[in-house]
Amino acid sequence: NYKGKESLSRVVMNQTFEDMKEIVRKNPFAQHIGMELLEVTEGYALGRIRLAKQYENIYGGMHGGCAYSLADTLSGIAASTYREYVTMLDASMNYLLPVEHTEYVYCKARVLRHGRKITVVRVELLNDEQTLLIDGSFTFYSIRKRDE
């Protein structure tokens, strides 16, 4: 049982940027990789992590799982901005360029389609120069509406 479950559920009920930042702050794995939430609007989330040695793969670039974790979290936040509890159904990522030689890795998550039950989110991971490194698509199922 997750210790912060009650407080996390309470935080998820609101949709302000500060509340979404609190969700990231209370997520132990997001904190472990130093994830920062920079912007949230309806259907959109922007965040970043600092590229660090402990996140590298054997070739010196960012490990794919670390990039996926950033995209997973940001796409979930973007999908949840419609006051719904969501769970991921499917995800696909295209690793276009190695993630290296950058201070930060940014993730932009934008809702492409928000339906009654299904939400599709496009993610883009970029370096400091805003070069597209990874893109992907995440599909979420809306479990139920949250109370206002």
Which sequence ranges carry the predicted segments?
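Terminal targeting signals and extreme-terminal segments of soluble enzymes
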Residues: 2-148
